[in-house]
Amino acid sequence: MADYQTVRTQGVAQPPAAIDEGLRAHMSKVYGTMSVGMLVTAGVSWAVGTSPALLSIFRDPVTLSPNILGWIAMFAPLIMVFAFGAAINRLSAAGAQTFFYVFAAVMGLSIAWIFAAFTGLSIAQTFLVTSIAFASLSLWGYTTKKDISGWGSFLIMGVVGLIVESIINIFLGSPAIAFAVSIIGLLIFAALTAYDTQRIKNEYVQHSHAMDQEWLDKSAIMGALSLYINFINMFMFLLQFLGNRE
């Protein structure tokens, strides 16, 4: 999604101090947008997951497995990510931000089942562990002098493999495959957190001289989306190991 728009290259070069100040503001917007998205997801998932009436809309009353609406809710976030990437050039910054928050709400709907499957305490504890791990990895990605841009292709291939294996295991129902996917997925999205943080930082440093505020605003939203997805996946994979079943 890094190539979602064409950046103007004309402009007056900014002094390092201006870049540092602008970068801090840019990263604050990225993390702020991501945090609001997390709150939206948490609110929707809690509201649906703790309401038997709402939860019953998305699962079979006898088997408790997802019904048609449940499957749609589960796959909707994945479809929306691809749609977001394809539409970002045509969206305004305000439109992109609205799309992101709608996506966060749909994501909350897709993971609402965790409140019926795991205890509230274990969900909270897993969220705390994920937050600490995410913050540490993102900080390392931001501050490291090591160029980790080469990780990108490998990690994207890993994500594609995870998606394929997860879909296959929906039909196989293999605990061994589910365990392997959780371990590998956790490692991949942990690495993506550091990688995406450095990428977001470098994109700003390389293109901030263009002074295109619309581009910077959309870049911050796309950065927030990337980090949000990493956080959600780390949380869901960790929940498989740390969550206590109801």
List the model feature ranges, each with a label:
Residues 1-246:
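A hydrophobic alpha-helical transmembrane-helix feature that marks the membrane cores
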